[in-house]
Amino acid sequence: MAKETTDGYELYARQIYNAFKNESEILVKILDLLFEIAKSDGIIKSEELNYLEVVSKIFNLDEKTFRQLFAQHKSEGNPYEILGVKSTDDFEEIQRVWKQMVKNNHPDKLIGKGMPIEFINTANHRLAAINSAFEEIKNLNKL
């Protein structure tokens, strides 16, 4: 049943939020995993995206975080969206944001916290998307 529908998910999302409301980093990782599950059939469908957006709101995550995660999981993510920066930002600011994201999303950090392998695998994918976006921005700006 759970594989076929998202009915009743709000209750579970609230329970997760209550368990980790003071650890937004974990809530972001959980939402990241849910994005991975949603795209497991190759594309994130509109109803799945709606579900993920509701979960994000229940988790009290900001819109920027949601957009970044979505951009990282789209097959053609905008590199600026992935990093949560604007194309008009100067390169030093973009690089600062990239370094902070690498630090916050590095798998070794999760390993040190004893996180499950699923979190670590997702962190590897996320870090690859972050690094790829930064490289694409460097190439676009011929740096």
Q: Which residue stretches match the model-derived regions?
A:
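Small-residue-enriched hydrophobic alpha-helices in membranes
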Residues: 1-39, 46-143
